[in-house]
């Protein structure tokens, strides 16, 4: 009879920039532990705490009482920043900054393993390991643009203090580089509000790729700082949709996660909003629209995801759809169709334009990466192309990466989401990884013996270097004498083909 090993389960609070090196190899995190018996592997569980409401975050978005939402529309207010002479919203494509990004491992690979895979039909072989890189992966244009603008700001303002209102993107390596360059995230006070007291008029403040709330923009304008706005244009497109909905007195139904920075910023551009996480919550809302229900139950269910004073009986008569750009495209589209169908049933086809607004705000880059993973997993019936497992590389707090991980999980393909090479322990044949829904696991002997085909993808905030280092850890797991992949400088003579701007 086989003896099942004991499994140690830990409940650990996760925080900003959680990484394998910090959660596993660094200072131990406080935890309550208990021993349970489970088959096959050692499991280390990190419990993710619930976030506070989007409205709470907006209410305490600064420590300055005057930072209230401007009376003009958010879109008009953002345009007004351009008239200050202290607002930059586009990169200048400085070559030195791009070169430094690659040197620091936060740009595109032009000579390393990923570049060599691109030149080899997105494949690589090491001994009996075959690696298949997704056709669309890693840095999207908006993320590269944000990091590039931060590097350009450091070059342009070398003697000025530079602040970030939040992580510039959801990747630990990139955020560590920001800190090394003395570009630091504005600290939070005990109550969670950002402490702008150390920001002075001569300073530079960088807004991250997922944007900032109207309240924060108003505060920064009043402080008369130099603003470098790296907000992804796709996120700005969502804000435009929400602003249009507000001007036409429609409630914005936002498909997203209420605690995500992008959704918090998007909500600040709305007059009235309701955030739904998935199709199940959207079905609940649509059932209420058609049949009514218990208002108190509704308000309790969505207490963290509604604007102040929200009344479902009043505010669901006219709605518009918006989305967090990193959500699953198919689910956003399904929610849109459900809302449209519901409003037609409620108000009739002739009145649909008065009661429902929709604008295509789905990010192409997010969809391309999801489609590429579907393509990877879509050949499991073909023995020559079947994947034995999938590696997903990206920050553990990255929403778009979680949805990439979700795809192989739904297909029952062994998949491991790691955020850096430190998650892989070649000596002990162990991998620390995360599930799409936030559980951290330690898996022993995760890499099968014999010939193995591995699919690889990475989140839109993940630089190529992170993928290269993860794959090198995989190869070292197979062969302890592995010494790395030599750069191919012949590839470096040609310009890097970057992901397309949409």
Curated annotation (Swiss-Prot):
Catalytic activity from the UniProt record: dimethylallyl diphosphate + 2 oxidized [2Fe-2S]-[ferredoxin] + H2O = (2E)-4-hydroxy-3-methylbut-2-enyl diphosphate + 2 reduced [2Fe-2S]-[ferredoxin] + 2 H(+); isopentenyl diphosphate + 2 oxidized [2Fe-2S]-[ferredoxin] + H2O = (2E)-4-hydroxy-3-methylbut-2-enyl diphosphate + 2 reduced [2Fe-2S]-[ferredoxin] + 2 H(+)
Annotated (2E)-4-hydroxy-3-methylbut-2-enyl diphosphate binding sites: 170, 260, 325, 398-400, 461
Cited Pfam families: LYTB (PF02401)
Cofactor details (free text): Binds 1 [4Fe-4S] cluster per subunit.
Cellular component, GO annotation: chloroplast stroma
Residues annotated as transit peptide in the record: 1-48
EC nos: 1.17.7.4
Keyword Glycoprotein carried by entry: no
Main enzyme class: oxidoreductase
GO biological processes: dimethylallyl diphosphate biosynthetic process; isopentenyl diphosphate biosynthetic process, methylerythritol 4-phosphate pathway
Keyword Repeat: no
InterPro entries: LytB/IspH
Pathway field: Isoprenoid biosynthesis; dimethylallyl diphosphate biosynthesis; dimethylallyl diphosphate from (2E)-4-hydroxy-3-methylbutenyl diphosphate: step 1/1; Isoprenoid biosynthesis; isopentenyl diphosphate biosynthesis via DXP pathway; isopentenyl diphosphate from 1-deoxy-D-xylulose 5-phosphate: step 6/6
Active site feature: 262
Binding site for [4Fe-4S] cluster: 140, 232, 363
Compartment(s): Plastid, Chloroplast stroma
Cofactor(s) needed by this chain: [4Fe-4S] cluster
Any one GO molecular function term: 4 iron, 4 sulfur cluster binding
Keyword terms, alphabetized: 4Fe-4S, Chloroplast, Iron, Iron-sulfur, Isoprene biosynthesis, Metal-binding, Oxidoreductase, Plastid, Transit peptide
Superkingdom of the source species: Eukaryota
Family: Belongs to the IspH family.
Function: Enzyme of the plastid non-mevalonate pathway for isoprenoid biosynthesis that converts 1-hydroxy-2-methyl-2-(E)-butenyl 4-diphosphate into isopentenyl diphosphate (IPP) and dimethylallyl diphosphate (DMAPP).
Subunit structure: Homodimer.
The name this protein goes by in its record: 4-hydroxy-3-methylbut-2-enyl diphosphate reductase, chloroplastic
Species of provenance: Botryococcus braunii
């Amino acid at each position: 009879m086989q003896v099942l090993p004991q499994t140690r389960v830990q409940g650990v609070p996760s925080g900003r920039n959680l990484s394998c090196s910090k959660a596993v190899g660094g200072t131990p995190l406080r935890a309550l532990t208990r021993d349970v018996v489970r088959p096959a592997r050692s499991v280390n569980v990190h419990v993710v705490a619930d976030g506070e409401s989007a409205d709470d975050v907006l209410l305490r978005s600064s420590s300055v009482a005057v930072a209230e939402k401007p009376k003009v529309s958010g879109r008009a207010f953002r345009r007004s920043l351009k008239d200050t002479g202290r607002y930059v919203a586009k990169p200048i494509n400085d070559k030195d900054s791009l070169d430094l990004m690659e040197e620091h491992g936060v740009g595109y690979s032009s000579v390393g393993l990923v570049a060599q895979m691109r030149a080899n039909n997105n494949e690589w072989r090491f001994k009996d390991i075959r690696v298949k890189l997704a056709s669309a992966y890693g840095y999207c244009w908006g993320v590269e643009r944000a990091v590039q603008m931060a590097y350009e700001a450091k070059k342009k303002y070398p003697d000025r203090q530079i602040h970030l209102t939040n992580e510039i993107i959801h990747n630990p390596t990139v955020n560590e580089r920001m800190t090394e360059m003395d570009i630091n995230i504005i600290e939070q006070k005990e109550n969670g509000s950002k402490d702008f007291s150390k920001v002075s008029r001569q300073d530079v403040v960088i807004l991250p790729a997922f944007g900032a709330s109207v309240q924060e923009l108003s505060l920064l304008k009043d402080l008369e700082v130099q603003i470098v706005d790296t907000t992804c244009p796709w996120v700005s497109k969502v804000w435009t949709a929400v602003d249009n909905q507000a001007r036409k007195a429609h409630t914005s139904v936002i498909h997203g996660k209420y605690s995500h920075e992008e959704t918090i910023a998007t909500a600040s551009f709305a007059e009235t909003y309701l955030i739904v996480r998935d199709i199940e919550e959207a079905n609940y809302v649509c059932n209420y629209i058609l049949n009514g229900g218990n208002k108190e139950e509704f308000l309790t269910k969505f207490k963290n995801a509604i604007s102040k004073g929200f009344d479902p009986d009043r505010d669901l008569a006219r709605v518009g759809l918006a989305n967090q750009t990193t959500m699953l495209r198919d689910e956003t589209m399904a929610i849109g169709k459900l809302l449209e169908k519901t409003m037609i049933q409620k108000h009739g086809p002739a009145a649909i334009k008065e009661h429902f607004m929709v604008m295509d705000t789905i990010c192409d880059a997010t969809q391309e990466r999801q489609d590429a993973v579907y393509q990877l997993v879509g050949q499991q019936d073909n023995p020559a192309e079947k994947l034995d497992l999938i590696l997903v590389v990206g920050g553990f707090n990255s929403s778009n990466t979680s949805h990439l991980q979700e795809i192989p999980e739904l297909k029952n393909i062994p998949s491991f989401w790691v955020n850096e090479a430190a998650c892989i322990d070649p000596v002990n044949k162990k991998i620390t990884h995360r599930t799409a829904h936030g559980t951290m696991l330690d898996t022993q002997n995760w890499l099968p013996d014999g010939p193995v085909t591995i699919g690889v993808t990475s989140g839109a905030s993940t630089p190529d270097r992170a993928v290269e280092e993860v794959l090198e850890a995989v190869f070292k797991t197979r062969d302890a004498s592995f010494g790395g992949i030599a750069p191919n400088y012949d590839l470096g003579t040609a310009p890097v083909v970057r992901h397309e701007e949409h």
